[in-house]
């Protein structure tokens, strides 16, 4: 066989090997880029940004059912993950460091603390409401007007207001927190929002108000009335010092919102983050016979709307 033909075959083999090596390197680089992007997205979702949707009209018209929102999870603190990554299995969290404090009028996303007689809430149930009362504040509602520390608080500019009917003062609503009051959603309180380190005297007049919060702090039903004595964990108690900061929250559409009036206060460690922006919005109901598709179901004027 001539030498030239042997050399030509050898050169071809080398070119094929080089091509194979380059292809493998490109594949590895691509997979590495995908892996880095995945890890970055996972870190971002775990610690910084969360996406969620609005299912109800309780925050109308600030937020509408069908809005897709971004939540700043780092607005107040950085915590360890609340869930095992890529699952819905909740795990205990630990605060790593603080980045700020929730303020009145902040729109927050939080883990639902439970109904008014419920100590252990449902897992993975998140609510979105507006902070009205901060730790230590006194909140009262008179004929649908909210007062904090005796000062009238104006409604959010986009909130739905329905003045067609107001429940009279003294007409009790059995759904209202706490039990045993003559309050209703339009005439509520006054109630003091618990603050970490705040000590309250306990008596038969206020134990229904504070008992649930104390039970939740112990994560067990520890408050009891034994004859004429109030006990906590079996020991007589005339007072209690709160271990956490709490917030009183309301929906902007107050006539169609289940909020602190019905199930009590939100502890600070249940707050997920602050609502930032609407990044997408779809009408939840499209008129029958409308065949225009998704284009006309999008609320284009709400995309990139900042949440105030």
Residue ranges and their predicted role:
Residues 2-26, 62-308:
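Soluble "head" domains of membrane/secretory-pathway proteins
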Residues 29-47:
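Hydrophobic membrane-insertion alpha-helices, especially the h-region
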Residues 37, 41, 50, 72, ...:
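Generic N-terminal helix/loop capping motif
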Residues 43, 56-57, 83, 263:
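Single-residue recognition of alpha-helix boundary sites
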Residues 46, 56-58, 257:
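Short linear Ser/Thr-Pro motifs
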Residues 50-67:
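Alpha-helical transmembrane signal-anchor/signal-peptide segments
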